[in-house]
Amino acid sequence: PFYLSIRIGAESYLNQNNIEMIRSFRGDPDFLSKLSMLDGLICIGKFSPQEISEFRKLTDKAIFVDLFMPKIFVNTIVMDFRTAVLEGLEYLASLGHTRIGFLGGIEHTSDGEIYFEQRYHYYQEFCRQKGWDNSRYVRRDQFSVESGYAMMLDLIGAHQVPTALFCASDAVAMGALRALHENNYRVPEDVSILGFNNNQNTAYTNPPLTTIYAPARQMGELAAQFITQFATKEKVYPMQIMLPCSLILRQSCTQPRSKKE
């Protein structure tokens, strides 16, 4: 849903402005051959340095959405993950939580390299700064409901259930929520859960999910705006645009029981 929202944002802007677009997906047999004779290129997702090099051969007027590659100088639109993650964790800490776990995914580029996952990185940074060793409460697999469910079951089976969980996506959070309910853990009384993305289902979970809003559609719209501007320029200098996220408070987080007693 996250990448789909980015794509919808980009396509909506292009359609409204009567700009012709060509869609190409990595799994297509003619993936790169579709991308000839372009005025601009919007690349959504994670790409290897080799793929980025191939795209730049096609056009220097490319913009990459949700790609964090600090040593490669290309046009990028990203979220401010650092501020978002730290705001979410500070919120949990302000409620009195110190045993804060992390459930997330591992992504790979096309050449098999593990992609630098900022949410996990800033979670680790936060715990180090607090002097907390919460490594036993960490599980990483995929960004899916099924993985969230399985990772939560693993924590329950290992008797390593924290008082709060930072979930790197709403899908992961919803899977964890299901596993907790099935094993008679109350949310938020026993375990607080914080998601990430604010997808359309999070307001209707039981309880409604506290989450971090990720501006996916706006990222797509902005990419389309810039790519149309690039088309009229002879030279484009690399830039990074970082959009803010925001904490959405609902009903899945509260003080740990020790603070209430």
Spans of features found by a protein language model:
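Ligand-binding clamshell of periplasmic/extracellular solute-binding protein-like
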Residues: 45-52, 170
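Bacterial carbohydrate/catabolite-sensing allosteric modules
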Residues: 5-22, 40, 56-64, 68-261
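Central regulatory/effector-binding core of bacterial HTH transcription factors
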Residues: 12-48
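Short acidic active-site motifs
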Residues: 28-31, 50-51, 147, 151
